[in-house]
Amino acid sequence: MKAVAGEDGTLKPGYEAAPLRTVDPAKRMKENRMEPIPYTGDKGYKLGDVLDKKVTMEEFVAQLSDDDLICMFRGEGMCSPKVTPGTAAAFGGLTPELQEFGIPASCCTDGPSGLRFDCGTKAFSMPNGTLLGCTFDLPLVEDLYEMAGREMRQNRVDALLGPGMNIHRNPLNGRNFEYISEDPYLTGWISAV
């Protein structure tokens, strides 16, 4: 539905066809699928060796078993003792085997309205995604997340879960307060800062 000028100049409801997807997502995924990295077993490489350019990331990852990869990405739930207390989840180097490879444990916290801790730690509360979208103020949003980044660093938090980029009024969504707007253009711009 959109506004259309009538013969007398007043606006009336009008309609236009909704755009249809022109990309086949399954085809695109198949075309961009990476080749599997063959398993080599432990060659003695550490994650720091990738940073020092002694080995490639592919050579490093080739040492990890399927179980290692599953443990790294499955992670642990709320309030893991291996990371900052009260955070939403831990992931990465949570097992002794992964730690031997030099992979650190990392954590994330819920963040649609700032950092959240479940242990009594105080944190700055930010406007949720919808309110940020209502400002149309990119420099303001950038300043807010600059501050959130500092707070994350101070509290040893590696990732912030939110705000979200789903579009309001999409039938697949479920957490509208986290989303920035029903306008995909505005959502993209606010998210990019």
Regions found by a protein language model. Name each.
Residues M1-V193:
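Glycoside hydrolase catalytic-domain context in secreted enzymes
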